[in-house]
């Protein structure tokens, strides 16, 4: 999320037409088209964040700027050339790194929160095995994972929470 993504498309000489057909999971479909005989591009229902990376007659790659969760979905590039029709199909999955927060609750137990990640993060504790992770799903497809380490009267001088996620791992330590 937040980065730019370029989806490549088959490069051919003698291209007659190139079409990107985009079907996101959220919102309606959009298309980007190019006709060589008129040297004309056209767009239907596409946001400004999606456009040709370069000139479509030279390189038909699609660039998505500031990728968001709404961009997740199917992307198909169709190239019509003198030597045939060519298709490139992608499914764009958007990863959202969670926000890591570590604090002590009212009972002196460390609580680790991996907020609004996509997919849900895995929360683990260094030198701690008695914890209960809870997941809360959000409307935008992200998930918050909350894990409370129960010490049962043991004084945890320094506890480390590790958050494992496809967008990157994080860790924080705290003394409660």
What are these regions (language model features)?
Residues 5-7, 60-62, 143-149:
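Short strand-edge motifs at loop-to-beta-strand transitions and within beta-strands
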Residues 12-49, 117-135:
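N-terminal V-set
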Residues 9, 20, 75-78, 92, ...:
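Core motif of extracellular immunoglobulin-like domains
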Residues 51-58, 102-104, 136-143:
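Short beta-strand segments within Ig-like beta-sandwich modules, predominantly Fibronectin type-III
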Residues 6, 47-95:
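Ligand-binding face of N-terminal immunoglobulin V-set domains in extracellular IgSF glycoproteins
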Residues 24-28, 56, 81-106, 127-133, ...:
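Flexible inter-domain hinge/linker segments at boundaries of tandem extracellular adhesion modules
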Residues 1-6, 103-111, 144, 156:
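Short coil/turn motif common to extracellular beta-sandwich-like domains
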Residues 5-7, 70-79, 108, 121, ...:
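Conserved Ig-like domain signature around the intradomain disulfide
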